[in-house]
């Protein structure tokens, strides 16, 4: 997900193609970083009513954040061709780094309470909606994020 915008910006696109790209990217993000984590947490947390409510609210927070971002991004693109330098609120993609860490801790029985998953969703979902500007990572930070993701994958393979 880190590279799709960079790839898209190398292509000459009409206004409608740009708008379509924003929408389809957000739909993909909603499924990958909203619905999938929500269903995962619901399943691993014992399919309780509380985890169903929390997971549903998490998906709703991701949806609201992405829809609001789309409105802001369309407006921004109509005013400038510059690349965005900040995010408004925590990006939905951050769950892809946080959820595996929590799962690894849970799997290694370092912390056995399965409610840690719904708590993560509450914190993360709240972060999606906070009107806080977060600076976009540069190349070095992106490399660190990729390295951390690779480390997570190998850790999950080795320890599970």
Predicted ranges, named:
Residues 7-10, 31, 35, 95-102:
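Generic hydrophobic alpha-helical membrane-span motif
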Residues 79-160:
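C-terminal membrane-associated helical module and adjoining short loops/tails
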Residues 1-2, 59-66, 121-130:
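Alpha-helical transmembrane segments and their membrane-interface exit regions
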């Amino acid at each position: 997900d880190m590279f799709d915008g960079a790839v898209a910006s190398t292509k000459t696109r009409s206004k409608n193609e740009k708008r379509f790209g924003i929408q389809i990217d957000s739909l993909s993000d909603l499924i990958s970083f909203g619905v999938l984590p929500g269903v995962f947490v619901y399943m691993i947390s014992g399919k309780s009513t509380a985890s169903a409510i929390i997971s549903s609210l998490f998906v709703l927070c991701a949806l609201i954040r992405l829809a609001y971002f789309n409105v802001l991004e369309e407006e921004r693109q109509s005013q400038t061709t510059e690349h965005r330098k900040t995010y408004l609120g925590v990006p939905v993609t951050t769950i892809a780094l946080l959820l595996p860490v929590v799962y690894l801790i849970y799997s290694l029985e370092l912390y056995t309470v399965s409610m840690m998953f719904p708590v993560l969703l509450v914190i993360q979902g709240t972060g999606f909606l906070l009107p806080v500007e977060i600076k976009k990572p540069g190349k070095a930070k992106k490399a660190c994020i990729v390295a951390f993701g690779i480390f997570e994958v190998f850790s999950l393979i080795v320890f599970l």
